[in-house]
């Protein structure tokens, strides 16, 4: 009798365990089904609007000249809006200004062909774009979320669609301005009055300038040697190096480099990190250029503007 009771209890335990397994398996299947539904991407629409739109980003700011009082004037910057994905309910992409890349999410109105695009909001420079599409151009405005945190809380923009394509042959054109206007340096100069013979010392502001070597040396195409670089100016080396990154669409934070490459019609900033896109020869050349930049010197001169 005892054996019979023991067998009955054992069978009951097995039955309960089996039910629990079935329940767990059913729940797991339901969860997996739910996960699959959540991960199914919404269908994309209007892929013809995908791409980079570049152009002027203008707003009024207080400008402080070297001489005279501050005044309010128009300040123009270069803006890139990159539209990556459009669905029925959402638009995804990123904005790039002054090398600062911010994601955005918004909506597209098919009836008016207009976008409302919001940056995340946790950076002081974040805001909302309200733009209208007209063929291959975007026009509209931007408003900062925190109007007291930025110099120009309201801006207008006029952008044209640009195709980004990496090309190792891209170079600065030979009519490019090679002066670094962003980093002037003061030098002590002497002046002798011809009438009195008295010599006086004064401070003169000078800017560094690159040489024509930047039009000839291409670190994306040729394997550089120490002989190629040993007599170059520091600014030469910096331009040759950063031309590599510009060809890959790097968004420069330093105004100096933006000034040089925005003179071209091929520079399209699309990312704030292109390290993984560099070719083996580019990586080797950048490493060599960095070594020479560390010890190179610049040539300064006086220039009117």
Whereabouts are the PLM-identified features?
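Bacterial N-terminal signal peptides that target proteins for export
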Residues: 1-7
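C-terminal motif of bacterial Sec signal peptides marking the signal peptidase cleavage site
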Residues: 15-18
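Beta-sheet ligand-binding and adhesion/scaffold domains
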Residues: 25-27, 35-80, 90-98, 104-192
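Sec/Tat-exported extracytoplasmic proteins
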Residues: 57, 241-244, 248, 293-296
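Surface-exposed intrinsically disordered loops and tails
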Residues: 66, 77, 185, 189-211, ...
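Acidic/histidine-rich, surface-exposed loop or edge segments in extracytoplasmic proteins
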Residues: 214-226, 268-272
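Amphipathic alpha-helical packing elements
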Residues: 228-270
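Compact alpha-helical subdomains of small soluble proteins
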Residues: 252, 259-305
